Amino acid sequence: MESNLQGTFLLNNTPLAQFPEMKAPVCQYSVQNSFYKLSPPGLGPQLAAGTPHGITDILSRPVAAPNNSLLSGYPHVAGFGGLSSQGVYYSPQVGNFSKAGNEYPTRTRNCWADTGQDWRGGRQCSNTPDPLSDSIHKKKHTRPTFTGHQIFALEKTFEQTKYLAGPERARLAYSLGMTESQVKVWFQNRRTKWRKKSALEPSSSTPRAPGGAGAGAGGDRAPSENEDDEYNKPLDPDSDDEKIRLLLRKHRAAFSVLSLGAHSV
């Protein structure tokens, strides 16, 4: 009785009868067959023209098997024809498709190391040392300065001997609070200056006049020779100040070379 009322409602409902295109085309064939099989013989022709949306019709519909022909009409989905509806996401065939990003090899190095651009100066970054910067650092070496006491002791030692052996150089450096390399370099520079001075004064190397001609000429000696003789004498504690004054006046040029300035005498 309920089915008859539903069929009568569907036939008498004019708004639904005016829109036959609202029928579902996918399930039309299977639903119509179910109507012919399950409905009574008298209601089959009547319900065929309507839209089967009754409760009994919906519950009596068979489970539609997956139809591969529905997807075959679309060329971009045809490649998935062999996959079932239940195993689309878990089928082992899915593993055959290349994953996104496989065509891009992974970088083992840092991308910044390949670019090597300095964002401030735009210069190429490299690990090679800069020869210009190395030369600047090497030129920053300053010349050591010595005190008056150290210069006096060095000059006194140089007048006695122009060359120092290893033990003598070490002893002198220790007594003056200097390093052996400083003493060695100072003696090298002092010998160079001494050779230049000797080359510019050839008269000092000429022999003196003998005997009678030079007897009365003893007082005609140059002041520098008198100072040298006075300088070569042993030091006397009572006259050290005078000898230091003569030494500083004689070697005034040495102070200007060492950037110490000349002492007032």
From Swiss-Prot:
Q: What is this protein's function?
A: Putative transcription factor, which may be involved in patterning of central nervous system and pancreas.
Q: Which UniProt keywords apply?
A: DNA-binding, Homeobox, Nucleus, Transcription, Transcription regulation
List the subcellular locations.
Answer: Nucleus
- Per its record, how is this protein called by name? Homeobox protein Nkx-6.3
Region Disordered: which residues?
196-240
Task: Spell out the coiled coil positions from the record.
Answer: none
Q: Which residues form the signal peptide?
A: none
The answer to whether keyword Transcription applies is yes
Annotated S-S bridges: none
Per the record, the GO terms for biological process are: cell differentiation; cell fate determination; glandular epithelial cell differentiation; negative regulation of stomach neuroendocrine cell differentiation; negative regulation of transcription by RNA polymerase II; positive regulation of transcription by RNA polymerase II; regulation of transcription by RNA polymerase II; stomach neuroendocrine cell differentiation
Q: Which Pfam families match?
A: Homeodomain
Cross-referenced SMART domains: HOX (SM00389)
Where would you say this protein principally sits, based on its record?
nucleus
Q: State the source organism's domain of life.
A: Eukaryota
In this entry, the residue ranges of the DNA-binding region are 139-198
Q: Which GO terms describe its cellular component?
A: chromatin; nucleus
**What species does this protein belong to?**
Homo sapiens (Human)
TM region positions: none
> What Gene Ontology terms describe what this protein does at the molecular function level?
DNA-binding transcription activator activity, RNA polymerase II-specific; DNA-binding transcription factor activity, RNA polymerase II-specific; DNA-binding transcription repressor activity, RNA polymerase II-specific; RNA polymerase II cis-regulatory region sequence-specific DNA binding; sequence-specific DNA binding; sequence-specific double-stranded DNA binding
